[in-house]
């Protein structure tokens, strides 16, 4: 009977230790997950901020490309017709 009580006490002690460390691990994992969520949000925010600059530059270069593209097409048409 004495060994049964000792074994039961050891089992209870091991269960208590396992439970207490499980919460610490879960809290660490939740904190890491929160950090990853924050990092992902910051990466998206930086990407969107860079996208605004890209949109501005694309607008400027897009106009220039259209302008030169029209001139190139009209030049090619004139050359094909033999007028140039």
UniProtKB/Swiss-Prot annotation:
Expressed by the venom gland. One of its GO terms (biological process) is defense response to bacterium. Cleavage of the propeptide depends on the processing quadruplet motif (XXXR, with at least one of X being E). It is found in: Secreted. Residues 1-22 form the signal peptide. InterPro entries: Latarcin_precursor. One of its GO terms (cellular component) is extracellular region. A motif (Processing quadruplet motif) lies at residues 55-58. Keywords: Antibiotic, Antimicrobial, Cytolysis, Fungicide, Hemolysis, Secreted, Signal, Toxin. Its main location: secreted. Residues 23-58 form a propeptide. Transmembrane segments: none annotated. GO terms for molecular function: toxin activity. The mature peptide (59-84) forms alpha-helices which probably disrupt target cell membranes. It has antimicrobial activity against Gram-positive bacteria (A.globiformis VKM Ac-1112 (MIC=0.7 uM), and B.subtilis VKM B-501 (MIC=0.4 uM)), Gram-negative bacteria (E.coli DH5-alpha (MIC=1.0 uM), E.coli MH1 (MIC=0.7 uM), and P.aeruginosa PAO1 (MIC=6.7 uM)), and yeasts (P.pastoris GS115 (MIC=6.7 uM), and S.cerevisiae Y190 (MIC=54 uM)). Also has a strong hemolytic activity against rabbit erythrocytes. Causes paralysis, but is not lethal when injected into insect (M.domestica) larvae. Belongs to the cationic peptide 03 (latarcin) family. 02 subfamily. This is M-zodatoxin-Lt2a. It comes from Lachesana tarabaevi.
